Amino acid sequence: MDILISKDRAIAPPSAIRFTECRLPGCYLLEFPSYRDYRGRFVKSFQRSAFEQRGLECDFKETFYTESAENVLRGMHFQVPPADHAKLAYCISGGICDMALDLRVGSPTYGEHESYELSAEYNNAVYLPRGLAHGFLVRSAPSVVVYQVTSEHSPAHDTGIRWNSFGATWQLSAPVVSVRDEVLIPFEQFESPFRFDPELVSKPMPAKEPAR
């Protein structure tokens, strides 16, 4: 939700990003602080200290974005170890139905999926830990989705799960899907290399020693 600022009032410093735990362990829905005035809008989309306080991996190595037309479906993508990564995804234009699939053997939600409505209007994002497949369906276009990931792209480790093989309800019978995504392996045939570690989900990061 935007905070409206009048012409005669200076913009206040951004407040903290709000984190809400999702059903899949280690996943969070984020709400960015946003301010709007007669010039436009100001949004804070990352705050390292807020991630570190929750023990969330946030040493992002790459940032990229996709621009997609309406009814385009991308997914379900991930990289296998040792090039796996955590991911932060959000819209700066349009809106999407974002989808995550838990591939971590031993997780209480292994094989289950969860969807999130993300949009530039909502100023929200989703954080996904390692071991989850990710994809989305465009609801309103043009949709520009930004990704920040904790490992660089590695073609040898880049793969995915077929979008219609794990029981998700996309509410669209014939989305626009790439040839690559149509031939990804179905979930029931995927032998997961990911293992669930509850310590990595809930353990806060140690406090940094002050600089001398």
Q: Language model features by range: what are they?
A:
Residues 2-121, 140-142, 152-212:
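Non-catalytic, conserved peripheral segments adjacent to functional cores
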Residues 121-123, 130-149:
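Ligand-binding loop in jelly-roll beta-barrel domains
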